[in-house]
Amino acid sequence: MSGNTIGNVFRVTTWGESHGGAIGAVIDGCPPGLGLSEQHIQAALDRRKPGVGAFATPRQETDRIEILSGVFEGRTTGTPIALLIRNRDANSGAYDGLRNIFRPGHGDYTYFKKYGLRDHRGGGRASGRETAARVAAGAVAALVTAAAGIDVLAYTIALGGVSISESGTTVNRESLANPLCCPDQEAARRMTGRLEEARNAGDSLGGIVGIVVRGCPAGLGEPVFDKMDAQLAGALMSIGTVKGVEIGAGFAVAGMKGSESNDPLSPGGFLANASGGILAGITNGEQINMRVACKPIPSISRSQKTVDREGNPVTLSIGGRHDVCVIPRIIPVCEAMVQIVLADFLLRQKAVTL
C-alpha cells in the first residue's frame, strides 16, 4: 500500500490499523533544536481521543503517546521522530459478524475490490482511528509553524443543519472553550439537541468545520502543481470523513462579478479577502480561511441494505462503539493537517530564498 506519506521536506508517514497493536507516525525532516516533549503531543491527542463527551464513541483509548526516537534531552535531533500510540481498548469481537459483509458508507467494498482482502475489524487502515497519528505529527509540525508566528484554529460552523451566526461571532480559543468547539453559544445549544435526536434515532450527523490561519507570511506555496491551496485541500480531503473543502469565498465566487471577487490593495494592505489569503497558489499574508464539509458517521444502528462478498442481499444494523458525529473530534485532525502542510512549505521556502 502506497500513499501513506505526506510532505516534501517535512515528511509524515502514518502506520497502523484500528484493531492492531498500535498506530503511529514517523516524521522525517524536522529541524533540530526544537523543544519537544510527550506532554506537548499528549495535549493535542487529548482533544481527539475517544470516550470524551456524551456523543462520542465509548471506546476508552487513553491514547498515551510514546516518543521512540528523534528527541534527546527534550530537543529534536534532526533525525526521524518515531511516535507510538498503543491500542488498548479494541473490541474486535463486535465485528465478527461483518467479516463477509460490506458496511454502507465505509471503505469495506472498495478496499476489498482493490486488495482482494480487508481487515473487517473497525475498518482497519481506513478507520478514523488512524487520525490520532496525524494529530501527534501535527503537534510536532506546530512547533515549526509557531516559530514563524503562525496560529491555526479550527472550529464548528455547522452541525446537523444548525449553523452559527458568522456575523459578529468572535473566533478565538476562549470562545471555543466548550464541548462542541462552537463560537456561537446559542447555535451550540441547538446543535446539542440535534445530536441527542440523532442518537435516540440510531442515526448520525454531518457538519462543517471552519479553519483560520493567522500570522502566515506572504510567499509560501509552489506553483504550479504544489500551490498552497491545492496542498491544503488535498491534505484535508485525505481525512476520511471530509467530502469538500472551500478556501476563501469558495463556491460563492461562481456567482460573483470580478469587481466583487478581486481583493483590492492599498498602501496599508489588502482591503478584502475573498481569496482566503492565497493568490496564484501563494500566500499573500492575509488570514487563510477554509471550510471543510464532513459527512455523517456511516456506522449507524438503523437498518441499511447492503450485500455480502458473494453479492447476496443483506439487511444490516451496525453494533459496536461509534460517534454520533465526527465533530468535535475531527477539529484537531483538521488543524494537524494544516500544520503539517504549512510546516513543509516553511521549510521548502528556505530552499528557494537566500
UniProtKB/Swiss-Prot annotation:
Any one GO molecular-function label of the UniProt entry: chorismate synthase activity
Enzyme Commission number(s) from the entry: 4.2.3.5
Gene3D superfamilies: Chorismate synthase AroC (3.60.150.10)
Pathway stated in the Swiss-Prot or TrEMBL entry: Metabolic intermediate biosynthesis; chorismate biosynthesis; chorismate from D-erythrose 4-phosphate and phosphoenolpyruvate: step 7/7
Family annotation (CDD domains): Chorismate_synthase
Record keywords: Amino-acid biosynthesis, Aromatic amino acid biosynthesis, FAD, Flavoprotein, FMN, Lyase, NADP
Keyword Amino-acid biosynthesis on entry: yes
Residue numbers binding FMN: R125, A126, S127, A280, K295, P296, I297, P298, S299, R321
Residues bound to NADP(+): R48
Function description: This reaction introduces a second double bond into the aromatic ring system.
Protein name, entry field: Chorismate synthase
Species for this entry: Syntrophus aciditrophicus (strain SB)
